Amino acid sequence: MAEEDGLRAINPNLAVNPKLAETAQADQIDTVLEALDPDRGRPEEVVTSRNVSLGFGAKTVISGVDIAFRRGTITALIGPTGSGKSTFLRTVNRMNDKVAGFRHEGDITFDDQSIWSSHHDLLTLRRRIGMLFQRPNPFPMSIRDNVVAGVKAHRIAKGKQLDVVAEQRLREVGLWEAVKDRLGDSPFRLSGGQQQLLCLARALAVGPEVLLLDEPTSALDPISTEYIEALLATLVPALTLIIVTHNLAQARRVSHNTMFFYDGELIEHGETTQLFENPQHADTERYVSGRIG
């Protein structure tokens, strides 16, 4: 009940305050973000995987994945537990780099440059390709400081501009009205759904081009899930979203395209409605019909 009450306090319009967006400070921040990424928005295929195989030690998790993600779309990665979809997702912004025994073959490119090349330093890559995890992970700092943590780290804004960023992004995710009078409070006093929205605001604050989502609503109640799904739809085409989900109904609701992984291989991919209603591979049909899972 507390979760429902908390989310009812959120602005249902899912829109940035027009007056705020028109302020000079907000314009300055957008200018800084554009200056950091002069190549933003050019290639149609923003992320491309070429014959990618991934593993840990002697165990191969993913084999021979060839796929391209179109800019400004939502792609769902589906498949049984252990099929490799989360490993693939976490490799796109190199979250697996520090995992013991991680190895990769083939290449993943972002804006036509290998994510492992010197063209992409790791800090900048993870700013441009953000991530939202399965469980909310707010930092042990105030609500306001959570939103602007990355902005400060990347020196995108400073001083009073940070307050503008915090308000702008909290409004964007619809959380501002619920927290505007307690920005100095601990985020751990928020409901689970509100914490996930805070983490989304934090990810958006640094101006990513791609957002990776690893089962972002699996730990949330249905009301929070519905709200976040609606919010994700407002983020495209400005962003490219790649979402791992075990919820097939969610994949159908939110995505333009779907990739089906099974036993470490990309079995089938295509337009979401087509894949669910007219799958071309027997394993895909068995999975989307619920006969394997």
Where are these regions (language model features)?
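The feature captures the beta-strand-to-loop junction immediately N-terminal to the Walker
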Residues: 78-80
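ABC ATPase "signature
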Residues: 269-270
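Catalytic Walker B motif of ABC-type/P-loop ATPase nucleotide-binding domains
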Residues: 211-214
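Conserved ABC ATPase "signature" region
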Residues: 107-114, 159-181
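Conserved signature/switch motifs of ABC ATPase nucleotide-binding domains
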Residues: 206, 237
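ABC ATPase NBD coupling module
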Residues: 101-104, 114-130, 153, 275-279
